[in-house]
Amino acid sequence: MFDVYFGGEYLGELDEKQLIEKAVEYLQPVKLIDVQIASIKEEINQLRANLTSIGAIDYSKDRVTGGGTPQGLEVSVSMFMDTVAERDKRIDELSKLKCDAITKIDALDEKLGAIILRYEFVLNNSTEDAYKMIGCYSTKQAKRYKLKALLEFGRKLVQ
């Protein structure tokens, strides 16, 4: 059991299993960050494509006319710019979360376990593939290193 303090306030005791759960709870969302960022970038690209098509050329008339600047285009552009700014802010938040996780993993004393955590949670490899990255250790040994690293990670989260 470990006493947990947050901001000088006593929060109670956590056992090893709870500390490991806290570490996994923190790291699990990190696995999806690259996918989330890619989808946000795709969303921004689609918004840009939609924006450029607002002033499209009208071929349905006898005389071809350009889209010009229809009334309300300024509002659409403004909304687009606001949405892009929001999405860019979300990308920054996700990037910061990933960088924080990397920094915390790098600070672990359990280096073999840290390698496993990096491959599994930061680089989004399967657990089995992450175990292989530490070299000639059995799966059982690799699991122990991972659990030691998760326990250390959990302790550092609650300190």
Each predicted region: which residue ranges?
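N-terminal interaction/assembly modules
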Residues: 1-107, 159
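Topology signature of small-to-medium multi-pass alpha-helical membrane proteins
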Residues: 88, 123-129, 146
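Hydrophobic, well-ordered secondary-structure scaffolds
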Residues: 93, 117-118, 146
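N-terminal positioning helix adjacent to the helix-turn-helix/winged-helix DNA-binding module
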Residues: 97, 111-113, 145
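Short, conserved sequence motifs enriched in acidic/basic residues, glycine, and aromatics
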Residues: 107-108, 136
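Short amphipathic alpha helix immediately N-terminal
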Residues: 108-125
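Helix-turn-helix DNA-binding module
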Residues: 124-140
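DNA-recognition helix of helix-turn-helix
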Residues: 135-156
